[in-house]
Structures are given as C-alpha cells and as structure tokens.
Amino acid sequence: LYIDIGAENKEDAEKYVNLGDCVYFESEFTELGENRIKSKAIDDRAGCAMMINLIREEPEYDTYFVFNVQEEIGLRGSRVSAFSVQPDFAIVLEATTASDIDGVSGAKKVCELGKGAVVSFMDRSTVYDKELYRLAFDIAKEENLPCQTKTMIAGGNDAGAIHITGNGIRTLAVSVPCRYLHSASCVIETDDLENSYRLVKTLSKRIPEI
C-alpha cells in the first residue's frame, strides 16, 4: 500500500508523520435497505456486539468473556487469554467471508447472507469439537433458526490458538456471514447477527449437557 500525503521530500513528510504511525480507512456506518449494514471492522465488531448482550444474561456457571486483540497478526491475544483462563469449552464469535456476489457460484461462495449463523466443522487452522458442532445445529433446528456451514475449508480465527492451548480446549466458532471481509465496507444482514446471537445464547446454556 502506497500512501501519498503530498509531501515534497523527506523533511516535509516528517512534519506530518512519524515512522510507525498508524493509518486506517475512513468509512461511515451506513444502513443498506431494510436489514443490511455497511461498516469497517465488522469482523469483529459483530462478535463484540453479541458478547456484550451475552454478558447481560448473567450465565449460571463461571463464564469468561474475552475481547481479544491482534487476531489478524498471529492470534496473539487469544493465545494469552486461553493460557490464562484454561476453560473447559470456548466459543469464538466473529464474522466470516461470504462471497455470495455476482460471478461467484457453488461452493466458492463459502457462505451466504440471509442464511443465518455460520457454524464451521473445520477451517484452515482448526478442527472444531464435533459434539459442540452437532449441538449447535440441533439447537438451530429446535428453535427454527437459520444456520449454515462453510462450503469450503477457508479462513481461520482465534480458535486456531485456543483449541491447542494446554491439554487442548473444546472449541466452536459461530460466525456472522460478511461480504467484503477485512475491507472498509463490510456488509452483513442484521437478521444474521440476531440469529447468531440467539443461537449462541441457547448454546451457552446447554453446554453442560455435553
């Protein structure tokens, strides 16, 4: 990425910026139609939004809500938090790639907007706990919640570090399908966000069944 700030030379540039300064894409939160939103950093603001609501539920057993950092540059935060907490189970909340746009067909879509939460059995960094995976889909069926799985082994998230911490941690990821992931104009459907939250809310209560 080359950024032209209009400086004439090095000395001129140093008046405005320093080595190591951070930059970001300017992007405004926008509503698209009746139930879609566009914003930067929906991965992982979507996960944060779900967690904030889950915190208000006051879980019946000891639950740690961790807002990890630096996932995109090495799963650093999740590695430290998983080592510190050593949980019995972990649920990763995030957004994941939806390529359901013109010119993309079949399995290459990975997942689609409007089809609910994405519960993966596997991605590039994790093989998820099969009992958690099955429980998630059982709950979705019982509560009539739309739910899908990825049609390709693609992407990864904090689960990649969490599930291999210590003696291993039983882990599942529940994701909101998101177009244009990692861009300044991510797009999701609010129904998918709400249905993902409802799924995780029930899942977190029923984990002791496993």
Regions found by a protein language model. Name each.
Residues 1-210:
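N-terminal hydrophobic/helix-forming segments and targeting peptides
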